[in-house]
Amino acid sequence: MKSNVEKVSNLSRKLNIEVPAAAVQTAFQKIFNGIQKEVTIKGFRKGKAPLATVKSLYGDRVKQDVVQDLIQKHYAEALNEHKLEPISYPEFEFADPTENKDFSFSAAFDVRPEITLKKYEGLEVEKEKAEFDPKKIDQVLENIRASRATFEVVAEDRAVKMGDIAVINFEGFMGGAPLENGSGTDHHLELGAKQFIEGFEDGIVGMKKGETKTLSLKFPDPYHSAELAGKPVEFKVTLNQIKAKVLPELTNEFLATLGGPSDLETLKKSIQEDLEQTETKRIEDAFKNRLLKTLVKENPVEVPPSLMKEQKASLVEDFKKRMSEQGMGPDDFASYVEKWDGDFEKTAAEMIQSSFLVDAIAKKHDLFCKKEDLDAKFAEYAQQTGIEESRIKEFYGRPEQASRLTYMLTEEKVIAFLNKSVKVKEVPAGSLKEENH
């Protein structure tokens, strides 16, 4: 076997391989002989058909099997010979093999970038200071009351206000023409819930029962329907009825119906613990993301094209799934993806770069996930979920799930290592803009 490597780009390689005629003929003979023994051909006993007859009937199938056999064997040998470790699926090119002739094929793939760790200890990273606002407890309590609210028809002659339910008829118009799917009859709209575009609910506030009003508004940009984004629109609105929201009092009797603590002080304490736990997790997750971004910034890594394509496609698919759940159609989705293409690419690049750097740091400091780390995590999951540990192990025995968990635990160990030397700059809560797409 002869082989050579072409450097297509910094991280792309093309491996050219030539298999000698003798090896090709051996592969042909092995496969023809196997078929000859297996098949039954009319006029001959099983396994007794002449080889020439077998070749005439099964030649195309044999060529496919020969290609598979030769590539499977000699591709692996060539990789080992040139000490190559592809990180992408190879793209093979070859012509049909011929008996007693050399067989040439090539494999194109990407390789890992060489990682040079320049600065990863003593990184300076901003972190939000945990500050609990007691008003959030009151907000949760109000949300609980609102979830159990009842509504009563307002008999008095008064204007509708924020918090009321406005029962309306409405018609939308663009350029004087009716807006498709832009009308409703006896629609119950809670003012302040922001169910409609900006300005719609504010425009209804102050109206009285029986009053009709025209609202001149504009669709937001961006908007889930790209063809409407930023366009002016008019809504003709008639207020049919006003319903006032009646909130239950936070009595012990009411609290008992919630299935949790039956006294207010215990409930408040429980709410505070949940809020603090949620906020702590948000701050820690955001800090980890900024730490990894800083790591990438301080240690530039070239991204293999195939991984970029794959990771970006995965991000776009996740985004598509989220948006479709919110009612976005294919045309609108395509417009959004085009608009945010650069953001998808940037995020994909940072994810790939950080994974390479995490791997390099783990290798240098022996931080890779070990069996005891996995066992501890399995036990933790079992305790949290109540699921038998054997079933959890079975789930993570699947290659894809095992790979994800192993990387997650390795990343956790690397983050813990980096946290030992990181220089944290505390900033007020809510002062940092998160970049999530």
UniProtKB/Swiss-Prot annotation:
<dbReference type="InterPro" id="IPR008880">
    <property type="entry name" value="Trigger_fac_C"/>
</dbReference>
<keyword id="KW-0413">Isomerase</keyword>
<keyword id="KW-0963">Cytoplasm</keyword>
<protein>
    <recommendedName>
        <fullName>Trigger factor</fullName>
        <ecNumber>5.2.1.8</ecNumber>
    </recommendedName>
</protein>
<keyword id="KW-0132">Cell division</keyword>
<dbReference type="GO" id="GO:0043022">
    <property type="term" value="F:ribosome binding"/>
</dbReference>
<feature type="domain" description="PPIase FKBP-type">
    <location>
        <begin position="163"/>
        <end position="248"/>
    </location>
</feature>
<dbReference type="GO" id="GO:0051301">
    <property type="term" value="P:cell division"/>
</dbReference>
<keyword id="KW-0143">Chaperone</keyword>
<keyword id="KW-0131">Cell cycle</keyword>
<keyword id="KW-0697">Rotamase</keyword>
<dbReference type="GO" id="GO:0044183">
    <property type="term" value="F:protein folding chaperone"/>
</dbReference>
<comment type="similarity">
    <text>Belongs to the FKBP-type PPIase family. Tig subfamily.</text>
</comment>
<dbReference type="InterPro" id="IPR005215">
    <property type="entry name" value="Trig_fac"/>
</dbReference>
<dbReference type="GO" id="GO:0061077">
    <property type="term" value="P:chaperone-mediated protein folding"/>
</dbReference>
<dbReference type="GO" id="GO:0005737">
    <property type="term" value="C:cytoplasm"/>
</dbReference>
<dbReference type="Pfam" id="PF00254">
    <property type="entry name" value="FKBP_C"/>
</dbReference>
<dbReference type="InterPro" id="IPR037041">
    <property type="entry name" value="Trigger_fac_C_sf"/>
</dbReference>
<dbReference type="InterPro" id="IPR008881">
    <property type="entry name" value="Trigger_fac_ribosome-bd_bac"/>
</dbReference>
<dbReference type="GO" id="GO:0003755">
    <property type="term" value="F:peptidyl-prolyl cis-trans isomerase activity"/>
</dbReference>
<dbReference type="GO" id="GO:0043335">
    <property type="term" value="P:protein unfolding"/>
</dbReference>
<comment type="function">
    <text>Involved in protein export. Acts as a chaperone by maintaining the newly synthesized protein in an open conformation. Functions as a peptidyl-prolyl cis-trans isomerase.</text>
</comment>
<dbReference type="InterPro" id="IPR046357">
    <property type="entry name" value="PPIase_dom_sf"/>
</dbReference>
<dbReference type="GO" id="GO:0051083">
    <property type="term" value="P:'de novo' cotranslational protein folding"/>
</dbReference>
<dbReference type="InterPro" id="IPR001179">
    <property type="entry name" value="PPIase_FKBP_dom"/>
</dbReference>
<dbReference type="GO" id="GO:0015031">
    <property type="term" value="P:protein transport"/>
</dbReference>
<dbReference type="InterPro" id="IPR027304">
    <property type="entry name" value="Trigger_fact/SurA_dom_sf"/>
</dbReference>
<dbReference type="Pfam" id="PF05698">
    <property type="entry name" value="Trigger_C"/>
</dbReference>
<dbReference type="InterPro" id="IPR036611">
    <property type="entry name" value="Trigger_fac_ribosome-bd_sf"/>
</dbReference>
<dbReference type="Pfam" id="PF05697">
    <property type="entry name" value="Trigger_N"/>
</dbReference>
